[in-house]
Amino acid sequence: MSVWNKGFTKETHPALRKTSETMRRKRIDNFRDWRDGMKRRGLIKSSYPSLAKNGDLAELLGIVLGDGHVHKHDRCDSLRIVGDAQKMGFVVRSAQLVYSIFGKHPKVTKRKSSNGVNITFYEKNIAKRLNIPTGARAQYEYCLPAWIEKNRSNTIRFLRGLYEAEGSLSHSPATYTHKFIFSNTNPHLLELVARLVRGLGFTVSNSANKIQVSRKDEVQKLSNLIEFRHYES
């Protein structure tokens, strides 16, 4: 016996969409009893407290600001970080940070059409607890929390997250040049990163969509300080 609505969703079938809209308008929740039972069994959270303010959270915030996205759904939020299949150290570390902070493993999937790897996590109030808005952030002016800015260790972890997501380290033997670059199209985020790196004692130059540390001794020192691309085997 075939199922008439197999393969359809409320977005792709008019009858399903109408039913969904009617249930939403009448505030009918088909899954309430199931959800309440799962909460009683401890399989679904019933509360979503503030996140522990520590180095792991500081680093994850940097990753999300650099290469992450928070999306608002009807009943929850989703956090997605995009990594590279050729840089699995970043993927594994990002997934571990999500688990460390939220206590739940994210879904890690390879994109079929590219080397991209999605690290995806669903839960209520992600945006509120991270204090990062949902949607696009091209011009978003992030207000760095005091628990990061006034703590050197947390500042370093925050910068590590940003550089792991959007940083590049290069050395040209031909020209004897060294470059440690952070790239981003958000001018407010670039200025924040430049200010924090200068505050740690490094010389920074600014240009379109990137900031750069280029003194040989400083490049290696900054790379070592934030443990750039250093992953546990």
How would you name each of these model-derived features?
Residues 1-233:
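Internal intein/HINT superfamily modules and their associated LAGLIDADG
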